[in-house]
Swiss-Prot record:
Protein location: Endoplasmic reticulum membrane
Gene that encodes it: CYP719A3
An example Gene Ontology biological process: isoquinoline alkaloid biosynthetic process
Name used for this protein in its record: Trifunctional (S)-stylopine synthase 2/(S)-nandinine synthase/(S)-canadine synthase
Gene3D superfamilies hit by this protein: Cytochrome P450
Catalytic activity: (S)-cheilanthifoline + reduced [NADPH--hemoprotein reductase] + O2 = (S)-stylopine + oxidized [NADPH--hemoprotein reductase] + 2 H2O + H(+); (S)-tetrahydrocolumbamine + reduced [NADPH--hemoprotein reductase] + O2 = (S)-canadine + oxidized [NADPH--hemoprotein reductase] + 2 H2O + H(+); (S)-scoulerine + reduced [NADPH--hemoprotein reductase] + O2 = (S)-nandinine + oxidized [NADPH--hemoprotein reductase] + 2 H2O + H(+)
PANTHER family the UniProt entry points to: CYTOCHROME P450 98A9 (PTHR47944), OS09G0441700 PROTEIN (PTHR47944:SF4)
Keywords from the UniProt entry: Endoplasmic reticulum, Heme, Iron, Membrane, Metal-binding, Monooxygenase, Oxidoreductase, Transmembrane, Transmembrane helix
Enzyme Commission number(s) from the entry: 1.14.19.64, 1.14.19.68, 1.14.19.73
Topology class, membrane: Single-pass membrane protein
Tissues where this protein is expressed: Expressed in roots and at lower levels in stems and leaves.
Annotated Gene Ontology cellular component terms: endoplasmic reticulum membrane
Family: Belongs to the cytochrome P450 family.
Amino acid sequence: MEEMKFLIMNNPWVLFATSATLLISIFLFFRRKSPNMAWPEGPKTLPIIGNMHLLGGTALQVVLYNLAKVHGRVMTIWIGSWRPVIVVSDIEQAWEVLVNKSSDYSARDMPDITKIVTADWRTISTSDSGPHWSNLRKGLQNIAISPNNLAAQFQFQEKDIIKMIQILEQEAKDNNGIVKPLDHLKKATIRLISRLVFGRDFEEDKYVEDMHHAIEELIRISGYARLAEAFYYAKYLPSHRKAVRYVEELKQIVKNLIRPFLSVNPPTNTYLHFLRSQNYDEEVVIFAIFETYLLGVDSTSSTTAWALAYLVREPSVQDRLHQELDHFAKQNDRKILKVEDMNKLQYLQAVIKETMRMKPIAPLAIPHKACKDTSLMGNKINKGTRVMVNLYALHHNKNVFNDPFKFMPERFLKVDNQDAKGKAMEQSLLPFSAGMRICAGMELGKLQFSFALANLIFAFKWSCVDDGVLPDMSDELGFVLLMKTPLKARINPRN
């Protein structure tokens, strides 16, 4: 500290830079509010850091949920001294933003560092709504993950799950019955996405392993993006510059990984065929493909791991689910459950919904931005204003979900979508968001999640590694909601 003080006081350039930074931050702090827009009330701010002092200590979505109890269902949060965001924590206002005025709030506002691996924000999740975004989305939904194309994948998904079960059996034999399922779930999802993108089966593990590594590395350094988003001048820090260089290296790794497939003629029902037919430049093609992995792999596999963790903690729920699966399999002469069976299994679907309610994979979604002057609750909202919907808050509203912090799939078996309570539950459960920016891969994600979970519970009884030591349910928010401590469990074959 003394050395730093000496450096500042005796070097006029350092003194000037430090003073200028402080003065600019204070200037921004006092000039920040738009004179013709009344921002919703929120917690008191501090110069330079805004509300950052309130946002630590626990998961951000939980902090915002608790702040909303004090400051209202619509409040302003200052992330640093220059980035205000309106946080919505109530279903009525959430639907106003996401659905009723979906086109008004359909723009994006992303950290600068993300431009590197999104072709300058020209992918589905990062681009503003418009012809480019619409065309990309239609190509993915109407071709690559169309109902017919997904149905064609069922036989390959069955092979993948049989392979995963065999690997888990061997892992359990080698480790006194203990397994770590997450990486196996991720690799199965990578294989599925690869078939939809390229139209070929990836039996060899090299590409799968390399893609898995690229995704993990990008998630690992995602914290730097949040730092730069909070503090404008953080992008000039050595640590951020180092992160940018590392993301540039990852960009090259991803390009080298995907580029060899671009010269091959893919089947017409693949995402690659669609992208090439649109004459997009190579960067858009590569990173539109990479986005399907980045947003699809961890979301599906992590949600499945969350479900397994809950079922380890709640043996009675696991037993009831297995009874349903076992009964259905015997009635339909199944050795494994098939993808087309998933929507016929009511309790399975209740477990799926309850897992996504408790641990929404993107609890704060991707922040929206007003693409024109609009309104919220009758109040003017200027073009460019950022709005974040706290899906976690919607999912834990005690007026909608009884005992909201308890894992209770039965709540979804009693729902009548025609009465007020049922409609409120249906409207409040938004794990994939809603409106025109709803997750493009929603149906694929739900199918893969249901299929993997059903067969893993059908094949094995899952229990604690040690008696009385329950799985850690602590989470951390990266691109998706991850388990802070990846699941380890003891498995016993059922058949």
